[in-house]
Swiss-Prot record:
Oligomeric form and interacting partners: Associates with 90S and pre-40S pre-ribosomal particles.
Region (Disordered): 1-216, 232-288, 304-341
Claim: Ribonucleoprotein is one of the keywords in the record: yes
One of the GO biological process terms: maturation of SSU-rRNA from tricistronic rRNA transcript (SSU-rRNA, 5.8S rRNA, LSU-rRNA)
Annotated localization: Nucleus, Nucleolus
Composition skew (Low complexity), residue ranges: 203-215
Organism: Talaromyces stipitatus (strain ATCC 10500 / CBS 375.48 / QM 6759 / NRRL 1006) (Penicillium stipitatum)
A GO term from the CC aspect: nucleolus
Chain segments annotated as coiled-coil in the UniProt record: 116-150, 241-283
Name of the protein this chain belongs to: rRNA biogenesis protein rrp36
Biased composition range(s): Basic and acidic residues: 109-146, 232-286, 329-341
Principal cellular location given in the protein's record: nucleus
Compositionally biased region (Acidic residues): 17-40, 48-70
Function: Component of the 90S pre-ribosome involved in the maturation of rRNAs. Required for early cleavages of the pre-RNAs in the 40S ribosomal subunit maturation pathway.
Length: 341
């Protein structure tokens, strides 16, 4: 039959339109069956021919529409592919790695993969970020160019920032030069101003030391009179507190007087030794002077001290010194040997 031939004919159309077309054809078939039952056999060939013609025309129109739609879709798909490829080339590897890590994490957790809408939104976000970064970079370069133009190319470059606080600092090798300049250099042999009060050459001279000691000799008499007064007060007072205070003052004054006498005696020993060495060099018995060591100087001072004392004072001093040395030796002994003695 012509109807069966028309129905069996293959048509080029999309899946959705084909389903719609089959529904329409099925409806028309039902109508045709009803008309066939009601109409006579004479009218059947005319109706069949008309229906076949209509079906053929509809199929041709649908073929043309399908061709146009497929061409448009192919051009649109190629344009979309090119645009996507250009945009994907601009995406950094870091952003792609982050997206891949997030997708892999969600898959490990058992979450469902993102839909097309979500992927599209992520792509849009990446494009937006790239666009903003590009605009910001262009804006910064333009600002720098304008600043350089305004300043005449003499703007100070900003110091480079560190990637982290643990990274080494970058320092310029150009060091700032001081503003002070030596216009005229003074000659090397020019005399410099000096203060004689703090000049070591003046203060350390033996002549100055001798003159100072000679100028303040009255202090020795004053110290001796002070010691005599303290001894008289100590003999008269009976209050224990005052006696303790007077004893302390008397001991301090005597120690100070003894120290000054030792220093004076040491200076006398050194002066006599220098005079003796000078005399020997002058006589030709020596070519170079001999300088006393500290230990030798101490022995000479002690010898002179004992020579200046009387016989009774010397014996007392020697006895005190012997006891002092013995006590110092006992301190070094262990406790067992101390008990035996």
């Amino acid at each position: 039959m012509a109807i069966s031939d028309a129905l069996n004919k293959r048509l080029r159309a999309r899946r959705d339109e084909e389903d719609d077309f089959e529904d329409e054809v099925s409806d028309e078939m039902e109508d045709i069956d009803k008309d066939d039952e009601s109409n006579s056999d004479v009218d059947r060939p005319n109706s069949e021919s008309e229906e076949s013609a209509e079906l053929e025309e509809g199929s041709e129109e649908e073929d043309d529409d399908d061709d146009d739609i497929s061409d448009n879709q192919s051009t649109a798909s190629t344009n979309d592919k090119k645009a996507l490829q250009s945009e994907f080339r601009q995406i950094s590897f870091g952003a792609l790695a982050k997206a891949q890590n997030s997708i892999s994490k969600k898959r490990k957790r058992g979450e469902e993969p993102e839909t097309d809408d979500k992927t599209q939104s992520t792509l849009n976000d990446i494009r937006e970020r790239l666009r903003k970064a590009r605009e910001q970079k262009l804006g910064l370069t333009r600002d720098n160019e304008t600043k350089n133009n305004n300043s005449g190319g003499h703007s100070k470059p900003k110091p480079p920032t560190r990637s982290s606080k643990h990274a080494p600092t970058v320092q310029s090798s150009k060091m700032a030069v001081s503003r002070k300049r030596i216009v005229i250099e003074p000659p090397s042999n020019a005399t410099k101003p000096r203060d004689p009060r703090f000049d070591p050459a003046v203060s350390s001279s033996s002549a100055r030391r001798n003159s100072t000691s000679n100028a303040y000799t009255f202090l020795d008499e004053y110290r001796a009179s002070e010691i005599k007064q303290l001894k008289d007060q100590l003999a008269r007072t009976k209050d224990p507190k005052q006696r303790e205070e007077l004893k302390r003052q008397l001991t301090s004054a005597e120690d100070r007087q003894r120290t000054l006498e030792n220093k004076k005696r040491e200076r006398e020993v050194l002066r006599e030794h220098k005079q003796r060495e000078k005399q020997l060099i002058k006589e030709g018995k020596k070519s170079q002077p001999y300088f006393l060591k500290k230990s030798e100087l101490k022995k000479e001072v002690l010898k002179k001290k004992y020579e200046s004392m009387g016989s009774r004072q010397r014996t007392k001093a020697l006895e005190r010194r012997r006891k002092k040395i013995a006590a110092k030796g006992k301190k070094d002994l262990p406790w067992a040997r101390r008990g035996v003695e």
